[in-house]
Amino acid sequence: MQKTKNTYKKSGVNINLADRFVEHIAKISKKNVKKKSKYLNKDNIGAFGSTFDISKIKIKDPLIVSSTDGVGTKIDLANQFNKFDTIGIDLVAMCVNDLIVQGAKPLFFLDYIAVGKIKFNKLKQIINGIVKGCNISDCSLIGGETAEMPGIYDNNKFDLAGFSVGIVSKKKTNTQKKCAKRRHGISCTI
């Protein structure tokens, strides 16, 4: 039996293109990090984990609020119209709105993009939209994952999910119980 060398390239994964994409993310993230974001390690992108220093945030009895979401079938619309920046913005909005309704101030955001094949320009549009959504929401993109999975996703298909974290004082949280007592809907836009 002859041994063959298994490589990412043979499996259909383009590490060089993925690295180029991470470099793009790091570049636009650093450029778009809010100057007041003294809590953020500005070199998070590309690391295996991301840090955010909450010890300097002046909130009494702080609670961390987290949310994760996706954009669902809007992905099909983005593919149909070949427009991908708006789903990046929408992804951030879906996650951040879930923080805001609980009274939390968004701190940071992470993304997950799964693709069959890395299409650099498409991914650039998506991530540029995510960064724009973070700017609108006054939070920072601090990390994420881009997974190239040939054979799992068709070459033009992808999935997108996000994760956001915010902070609120325990006394200022909007719980389901409080919202039910008010007997009116809550609507948040960013």
Report the location of each language-model feature:
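Glycine-rich phosphate/pyrophosphate-binding loop regions near the starts of catalytic domains
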Residues: 26-30, 36-190
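N-terminal amphipathic/basic leader segments beginning at the initiator methionine
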Residues: 2-35, 39
